Amino acid sequence: MTIYNFSAGPAVLPKPVLEKAQAEMLDYRSSGMSVLEMSHRSKEFDAIIKDAEYLLRELMAIPDHYRVLFLQGGASTQFSMIPLNLAKGKKAYYHVAGSWGKKAYTEAVKLSKTIPFEPILLASSEEETFSYVPTFDKDVIDPDAAYVHLTTNNTIEGTALYDIPDTNGVPIVADMSSNILAVRYKVNDFGMIYAGAQKNIGPAGVTVVIIRNDLLNSEPALSSMLDYKIQADAQSLYNTPPAYSIYIAKMVFEWVKSLGGLDQMEVKNREKSGLLYSFIEQSSFYQSPVKNPKDRSVANIPFTTPSKDLDEKFVKEAEAAGFKNIKGHRSVGGMRASLYNAFPVEGVIALIDFMRVFENQNSQ
């Protein structure tokens, strides 16, 4: 039985990458060592981390005046790191279109009790269960603010922000954890981008930060480990980095490049998601909780049946049929198909076939 992994993260990785990692597990390029055990100061690992940065710069067209960092702590640590480094004595705006954006804002509010800055809720769609991406008037933003924080893809709710809003000249800080390398964004539109690896980059353990030089803090942050300038000056080697996760990330970047790069990856992702959205649209049995088609994520597609009982039955039968981790997040319910870069189109077609049979067997 073929297994299709719909996990929202950690997520499916490219098979060629896993096979290469397997082949190099005990002896990386005749070094006599596994990447798991080699020094992060060795010439072998120095080449790995430099190649990873070079490839990511090439794929995303990252300008020279941005630094690329490979950090630890997941994207959630960035919720604290961002205000600690960027927001002292200033306003910081938060665009909240999903659960992760809310967590970023909540953490900022918590930090504002101990460091001097003012987190402001710019817009939120929480009152309608984050079923759409809210808009805002740029004129309400203080041009002297530190940043506007937004999330480009809402993993749980299945919405995404493709058109970057006007923020009245204030730098945008973007959480791209679940659609980095999936769709094209212009790096120049952002002051900072960050992403946890475990969706489209590699295994959990490394967090990518892309930050404009002028945003590197001039004053020390609360902790050296949480200081962007210290991390940048140390070239992500202030302490022992998540070496193996960076190694896998480098191979994922190579894989994306081999398939034609980011633009070709976006074409493939829109094809995959389009197949599933089209099927849901023509069905009277399945529903999408996302209100506006323009807000639909290409990476995470939630859907429901007519009842919670049928949702539970669907998940149980789908799991037995090889469709793993398709249960929706507990805050949304239903099902969620996460179609990250490494997820094959064949899996989408197989899921649609299963959905069609389930609908025929369970329609009133």
UniProtKB/Swiss-Prot annotation:
Which residues are reported to carry the modification N6-(pyridoxal phosphate)lysine?
A: 199
**What cofactors does the UniProt entry give for this protein?**
pyridoxal 5'-phosphate
Q: Which InterPro entries match?
A: Aminotrans_V_dom, Aminotrans_V_PyrdxlP_BS, Pser_aminoTfrase, PyrdxlP-dep_Trfase, PyrdxlP-dep_Trfase_major, PyrdxlP-dep_Trfase_small
Q: What is its EC number?
A: 2.6.1.52
Provide the residue positions that the database annotates as binding L-glutamate.
Answer: 41
Q: What pathway is this protein said to act in by its record?
A: Amino-acid biosynthesis; L-serine biosynthesis; L-serine from 3-phospho-D-glycerate: step 2/3
Cofactor note as given:
Binds 1 pyridoxal phosphate per subunit.
| Catalysis performed (reactions) | O-phospho-L-serine + 2-oxoglutarate = 3-phosphooxypyruvate + L-glutamate; 4-(phosphooxy)-L-threonine + 2-oxoglutarate = (R)-3-hydroxy-2-oxo-4-phosphooxybutanoate + L-glutamate
Give me the residues that bind pyridoxal 5'-phosphate, please: 75-76, 100, 155, 175, 198, 239-240
Name its cellular compartments. Cytoplasm
* Biological process terms in GO annotation: L-serine biosynthetic process
Q: Indicate the enzyme's highest-level EC class.
A: transferase
Under Gene Ontology molecular function, one entry of this record is: pyridoxal phosphate binding
Q: Name one Pfam family in it.
A: Aminotran_5
Give the GO cellular component terms, alphabetically: cytoplasm
Q: Which keywords describe this protein according to UniProt?
A: Amino-acid biosynthesis, Aminotransferase, Cytoplasm, Pyridoxal phosphate, Serine biosynthesis, Transferase
Top-rank taxon of the source lineage equals Bacteria
Q: Identify its protein family.
A: Belongs to the class-V pyridoxal-phosphate-dependent aminotransferase family. SerC subfamily.
Q: Provide the assembly information.
A: Homodimer.
What is this protein's function? Answer: Catalyzes the reversible conversion of 3-phosphohydroxypyruvate to phosphoserine and of 3-hydroxy-2-oxo-4-phosphonooxybutanoate to phosphohydroxythreonine.
Q: What is this protein called?
A: Phosphoserine aminotransferase
